[in-house]
A protein has these predicted regions:
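Long terminal accessory regions outside catalytic cores
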Residues: 1-13, 33-40, 46, 55, ...
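Flexible, non-catalytic linker and terminal segments flanking ANL/adenylate-forming cores
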Residues: 1-10, 128-172
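A short N-terminal helical cap/helix-turn-helix that marks the beginning
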Residues: 8-30, 186-190
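Conserved AMP-binding/adenylate-forming core of the ANL superfamily
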Residues: 30-64, 162-219, 250-253
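Conserved AMP-binding/adenylate-forming
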Residues: 57-98, 197-237, 241-244
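Short beta-strand elements of ligand-binding domains
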Residues: 74, 104-105, 118-126
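Conserved ATP-dependent adenylate/AMP-binding module captured primarily in the ANL superfamily
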Residues: 93-114, 127-141, 145-146, 188-208, ...
Length: 270
């Protein structure tokens, strides 16, 4: 199990302190499983590297500043989690009403935007994708704004966030501030910590299965996903994510849980 960050963050006053603490974690933070034996593991440090690079991309390529609007149309994917955290890092407002920046995985998700964002970030699902490998032409047919290839652009961004952290009163959702989000993250971390999540054998679990079955289809869902992820990470657990497009059955998920020493906390009543 990774270090429990609650003692360090119990009096935190900003999300920036959470991000800074996670950047020092070298144990697994995100573990992603999909079909064909695909497994991606990101330490806290690597996750925050993705977050910082993604936040810089939002600043440099999408003209994002504090209060700019962003919306993600996607099923749960580890890259989308990193990008949603980057939006918080940059002070963006999660909003699906005429967002300045849209995020999609393909033409089908791009078509869900009722009004074209100024910038559309295309994310590839491939584990080692260096660029978008899907049908770009199909995306052009449903979207008439500027299309940016996330995988091709993000790697060239600086490893450290180059912007200013948002003020605690900056809104993440309408009526929900950064300070509110921090309070929710710490609340969830304390819940994980108080339950002392354990395997059926009684041994401490190393990871918890992401419970949020939402897509990123609404701003509220997006925020619920990242709050659950950050709450678990602050409490010292890695977050196991199974690809929602893979259609894993409970019988298929069971050996994944066992191999990662992970727990589905819904079964334990968290």
């Amino acid at each position: 199990m990774a270090e429990n960050l609650l003692p360090k963050l119990s009096t935190a006053r900003s999300l920036n302190q959470v991000f800074h603490a996670l950047a020092a974690v070298q144990t697994p933070a995100i573990i992603w499983h999909s079909r064909g034996g695909e497994r991606i593991e990101l330490s806290g440090r690597v996750l925050m590297n993705w977050v910082d690079k993604s936040a810089n991309l939002l600043l440099n390529e999408c003209e994002v500043e504090e209060g700019s609007t962003l919306h993600i149309e996607s099923d749960v994917h580890w890259r989308c989690i990193a990008l949603c955290l980057a939006a918080l890092r940059a002070g963006a407002l999660l909003n699906n009403n005429e967002p300045q920046v849209g995020v999609a995985l393909d033409a089908a998700t791009a078509a869900r935007f009722t009004r074209s964002p100024d910038f559309l970030l295309l994310i590839d699902r491939g584990p080692l994708a260096m660029r978008y490998t899907g049908d770009s032409e199909a995306v052009f047919n449903v979207y008439d704004g500027e299309i940016l290839d996330f995988c091709a652009l993000v790697r060239s961004e600086a490893d450290q966030f180059m912007g200013m952290p948002p003020h605690p009163t900056t809104e993440v959702l309408a009526g929900v501030t950064n300070a509110d989000v921090l309070a929710e993250i710490l609340k969830q971390a304390r819940s994980f910590d108080s339950h002392q999540v354990r395997l059926d054998s009684g041994e401490p679990a190393l990871a918890v299965l992401l419970n949020s079955q939402h897509s990123f289809g609404t701003p509220e869902n997006a925020l619920a996903i990242v709050c659950e992820v950050l709450g678990a990470l602050v409490a010292g657990y890695a977050v196991l994510i199974t690809d929602p497009t893979a259609g894993f059955t409970p019988a298929e998920i069971a050996p994944i849980l066992a191999s990662e020493r992970a727990v589905d906390t819904r079964r334990q009543g968290k």
